[in-house]
Amino acid sequence: MASKLNTIGKSIAVVMVVVFASCTKYGYIDGGLSNGVHDCTMWEYFHTDSYNWDSTIIMIEHAGLKSLFDGTGEYKDITFFGLTSLSIRRYLLENGYERVTDIPEGKCKDILQKLIVPKRLMLEDVPRGNRLNTGGATFTEYDGMRCPALRGELFLWTFLKDYQGVPHAGGVVLNLASRNVEGAENEVIASSNIQTTTGVVHSLNYDFRFRNF
């Protein structure tokens, strides 16, 4: 009986160690990929998903901006509206480049800085709003929020999707647009609130277009 109790006690201890080891400095329990919380830097997170981020990693290094993502730079917490590898590869094809490093360093730095906010910004922090084309290259912003990026300014807003024919009964969608490019079209976030220890990633849709920024 004593041996059995000892075994049970050890099992409980192991479970407790696992639970506490999964907790991060933000006080949440890391559930891994399923809930978008990762107890690692943003830079380390990118390396766990080569399909979506391998070209992004190369672009960041080529632009000399790695320190923004690994926590060693000026900002310890950022929000990155992440352009994925597929968007980058399409840009290569459209512009006759063979490799990410063929893109001018200045261009890489410019587009990345326009997609980085120097603070942690969650989906829940962005108010409801809209941005509508009101003729030609003119867009009108409704509610939402203006947000300074490392370069330029963004307009952010959320709205509720319809669900099974019921208006505004679905999930919350995050959108953004550049306030620096006349006639820039709206961009949609495909996956929100990917949390890391150095900030938050909101992954842009695969059809993201460089020209809008």
Model-flagged regions — what are they?
Residues 1-23:
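Sec-dependent bacterial lipoprotein signal peptides
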Residues 23-213:
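Mature, structured domains of secreted/extracytosolic soluble proteins
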